[in-house]
From Swiss-Prot:
PANTHER family: PHOSPHATIDYLGLYCEROL--PROLIPOPROTEIN DIACYLGLYCERYL TRANSFERASE (PTHR30589:SF0), PROLIPOPROTEIN DIACYLGLYCERYL TRANSFERASE (PTHR30589). The chain crosses the membrane at residues 18-38, 67-87, 105-125, 129-149, 166-186. It is an enzyme of class 2 (transferase). Its main location: membrane. It comes from Cereibacter sphaeroides (Rhodobacter sphaeroides). Keywords: Cell inner membrane, Cell membrane, Membrane, Transferase, Transmembrane, Transmembrane helix. InterPro entries: Lgt (IPR001640). Catalyzes the transfer of the diacylglyceryl group from phosphatidylglycerol to the sulfhydryl group of the N-terminal cysteine of a prolipoprotein, the first step in the formation of mature lipoproteins. Pathway: Protein modification; lipoprotein biosynthesis (diacylglyceryl transfer). It is a multi-pass membrane protein. This is Phosphatidylglycerol--prolipoprotein diacylglyceryl transferase.
């Protein structure tokens, strides 16, 4: 059976130790940062494009700057709480302080989405601006972040797909990825992160 070996890529770009605590910059964190910055620039360009708006853009550039802060909080808090509630509630109920250990990983796309939607609605109500046009702007600016996030999922060797005998199947590392009932030897799986990066992010 032909397959693609998983590339030797570290999930960490680099790490430093300060006062006995190791801080690492991971590809996943970089994907979040780059996705938010690219999305912000895209929305800014759309706001400035007068031809897009018959009656003016739905918010000002100053409001966009404030919205970015709300979105960042929504992504981080929603993503983390979503992971806690959806994937390991028993562990975090027994060890609640572990919720704060974001450097150990654990974010949820669904939680991040709900966090951003909550932040969007709260911000628009506070600023007295229409929710739907602002939601349209965010939706148009989201694909680059999704693309980068899925590429980071691939680098982390997580969220892989079903076993496959197709030649582009990837032999992901780890006991869970290699646990394929009925398959002896190397188990190749669909690189679903790459599929999703292309379908969601381009």
């Amino acid at each position: 059976m032909s397959y693609i070996p998983f590339p030797d890529i570290s999930p960490e770009l680099f790490s430093i130790e300060l006062f006995g605590v190791t801080f690492a910059l991971r590809w996943y964190a970089l994907a979040y940062i780059a996705g938010l910055l690219i999305g912000w620039r895209l929305v800014l360009r759309m706001i400035r494009a007068e031809r897009l708006w018959s009656f003016g853009p739905p918010m000002t550039e100053d409001q966009l700057e404030r919205l970015l802060t709300w979105v960042i909080l929504g992504v981080i808090l929603g993503g983390r709480l979503g992971f806690v509630l959806f994937y390991q509630p028993a562990h975090y109920l027994a060890h609640p302080l572990d919720i704060l250990k974001v450097w150990e990983g654990g974010m949820s796309f669904h939680g991040g989405f709900l966090g951003v939607m909550t932040a969007l609605v709260a911000f628009c109500l506070k600023e007295r601006i229409s929710i739907l046009p602002v939601a349209d702007l965010l939706a148009a600016a989201t694909p680059p972040g999704l693309f980068l996030g899925r590429i980071a999922n691939f680098i982390n060797a997580e969220l892989w797909g079903r076993p496959t005998t197709l030649p582009w199947g990837v032999a992901f590392p780890g006991e869970a990825a290699q646990s394929c009932p009925g398959i002896e030897g190397i188990c190749a799986r669909h690189p679903s992160q790459i599929y999703e990066a292309g379908l969601e992010g381009i």
